């Protein structure tokens, strides 16, 4: 590849990464949405008191929209260590939250 080709491909990648007109941020994947920041680990310690809704994939990992008991919402992906540890320790509840439990 010549220098100009590399520059053009980088510019194209950057343009593709930008939000497109008419596509609301609400439709983007939860953990990539800047208005819906990931929930800090300390709030995930007792996940039996948190409502999880699977929302598809986030950067190649399963992602969940999370509603805490006080009504706050956020998101978390399966790459989060607190969530993985909890799922491993609650194999009976895991299938209700995530279809990928058999891989743990």
Curated annotation (Swiss-Prot):
InterPro entries: Chemokine_IL8-like_dom (IPR001811), Interleukin_8-like_sf (IPR036048). Pfam families: IL8 (PF00048). It comes from the Viruses. GO terms for molecular function: chemokine activity; signaling receptor binding. SUPFAM superfamilies: Interleukin 8-like chemokines. One of its GO terms (cellular component) is extracellular region. Keywords: Host-virus interaction, Inhibition of host chemokines by virus, Viral immunoevasion. GO terms for biological process: immune response; symbiont-mediated suppression of host receptor-mediated signal transduction; symbiont-mediated suppression of host signal transduction pathway. Interacts with host CXCL12. Plays a role in antagonizing the chemotaxis of multiple leukocyte subsets induced by CC and CXC chemokines. Displaces the interaction between CXCL12 and CXCR4 and thereby inactivates the antiviral activity of host CXCL12. This is Chemokine-like protein MC148.
């Amino acid at each position: 590849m010549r220098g100009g080709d590399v520059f053009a491909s980088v510019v194209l990648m950057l343009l593709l990464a930008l939000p497109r007109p008419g596509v609301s941020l609400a439709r983007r994947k939860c953990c990539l949405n800047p208005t819906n920041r990931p929930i800090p680990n300390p709030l995930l310690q007792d996940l039996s008191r948190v409502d999880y809704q699977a929302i598809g994939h986030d950067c190649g990992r399963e992602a969940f929209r999370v509603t805490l008991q006080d009504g706050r919402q956020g998101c978390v992906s399966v790459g989060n260590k607190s969530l993985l540890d909890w799922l491993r320790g609650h194999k009976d509840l895991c299938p209700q939250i995530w279809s990928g439990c058999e891989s743990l």
